């Protein structure tokens, strides 16, 4: 643990806090909290040994010490001193024969690094790279960490651009797009909360590692700020699931009911999307504070407490899956009613299905009911890969389907381009032929007619 942490170790610790939407069960992959607890116990044992062991027989020797990494006995002058790799390391079982080395000089002083007051030591046999397993769990977790970081970054960028587009064009302001904007906001907040959590843990871990302040790791995990960051992430994730549910319910109401009071129903949707998650995230935080107030709330000693959050999210996933099935049935019936050939029906059905999966979060059903405490080994990796990869890129797919390839958005861009082109052409004509005035009445009437037609179209499609 001396020095800055390697990428594998950091990815492992970050993923220990991710899972699907929350803490991992006790007994799953090693966490930062567990590692520092083991380090504390190792330090206690070392300090007891340093106090109780008898002094050496000679007067000249290198003093026994604990250097925040390993426990060193008294050293004989002019010799190498070695101790086994510290057992608190998460990968200690993979380097059972490894040792860390120091050199005791003839003067009875520990050899120091060049141009430094720190003692020299060789811990190459205890490093992660010496474990020999190219497909180790930590390397798999590093791969997942890279995947979900790239996914959230792309999703965040695409969603910000898509939100600006929907807000920038006045003709796109309608109930349907307001719902889309709230869904975009939930994805943006989810990505931001993950970035904040990762950045906080990375900064805290790296700083403590460089300064050998391992107690600072645990004190941060025990701090209010760490728990608030994690509580915020839980709320953002829950709100994201419930805005996906709102999208599904709204889609179904459009298909099932012909007349809707959109102003009233939009207020209801806002209450569901942003309000309902508070009803179970806040109680979960209170229960954790009262009965399981340890670490950064990333561990679940009692999985019943985690069900306070998990069950409402499973409910949202289940309802959206039922809506997905119902919508597919409606699409099939309408395609058959149009007397299309079987090939066209299959193609259109496949297109509709693939489009609805990211929009409703249907992929969540695959592992929705596989609880974290039951996932081990390969199943756990597949579960993590499916959830983290699909969820992180889902915002990007939603932005593409709801905005970038949307016909109304493309029409607005074409209209804006034509308007700019006509205005630019008009300015060029005015500057080159000032005596001649171009009549604008026809252009104005044409533009007005086009705008009215599009407004009516948008209102019809948004109703």
From Swiss-Prot:
Annotated site location: Interaction with the endogenous ligand GLP-1 = 121, 128
Which keywords are on file for this protein?
Answer: ADP-ribosylation, Cell membrane, Disulfide bond, G-protein coupled receptor, Glycoprotein, Membrane, Receptor, Signal, Transducer, Transmembrane, Transmembrane helix
Q: Which GO terms describe its cellular component?
A: membrane; plasma membrane
Molecular function via GO = glucagon receptor activity; glucagon-like peptide 1 receptor activity; peptide hormone binding; transmembrane signaling receptor activity
What transmembrane ranges does the database entry give? 140-164, 176-201, 228-251, 266-290, 306-328, 349-370, 384-404
List localization entries. Answer: Cell membrane
CDD domains from the xrefs?
7tmB1_GLP1R (cd15268)
On assembly, the entry states:
May form homodimers and heterodimers with GIPR.
Maturation and modification = N-glycosylation enhances cell surface expression and lengthens receptor half-life by preventing degradation in the ER.
Q: What is the effect of changing residue 127 to A?
A: No effect on stimulation of cAMP accumulation in response to GLP-1
Membrane topology (UniProt):
Multi-pass membrane protein
Question: Which cysteines link up through disulfide bonds?
Answer: 46-71, 62-104, 85-126, 226-296
Effect of substituting residue 176 to Q? Decreases sensitivity to GLP-1
Q: Name the major location.
A: membrane
Q: Which PROSITE patterns match?
A: G_PROTEIN_RECEP_F2_1, G_PROTEIN_RECEP_F2_2, G_PROTEIN_RECEP_F2_3, G_PROTEIN_RECEP_F2_4
State what this protein does: G-protein coupled receptor for glucagon-like peptide 1 (GLP-1). Ligand binding triggers activation of a signaling cascade that leads to the activation of adenylyl cyclase and increased intracellular cAMP levels. Plays a role in regulating insulin secretion in response to GLP-1.
Spell out the family assignment given in the record's similarity comment.
Belongs to the G-protein coupled receptor 2 family.
List the protein's name. Answer: Glucagon-like peptide 1 receptor
Q: Where is the signal peptide?
A: 1-23
**Which segments does the topology annotation call Extracellular?**
24-139, 202-227, 291-305, 371-383
Consequence recorded when altering residue 90 to A: Strongly decreased stimulation of cAMP accumulation in response to GLP-1
Q: Which residues are glycosylated?
A: 63, 82, 115
Annotated SUPFAM superfamilies: Family A G protein-coupled receptor-like (SSF81321), Hormone receptor domain (SSF111418)
**Region called Important for allosteric inhibitor binding, residue ranges:** 352-355
Kindly give any further remark recorded in the entry: Selective recognition of glucagon-like peptide over glucagon is determined by residues located at the C-terminal end of the glucagon-like peptide.
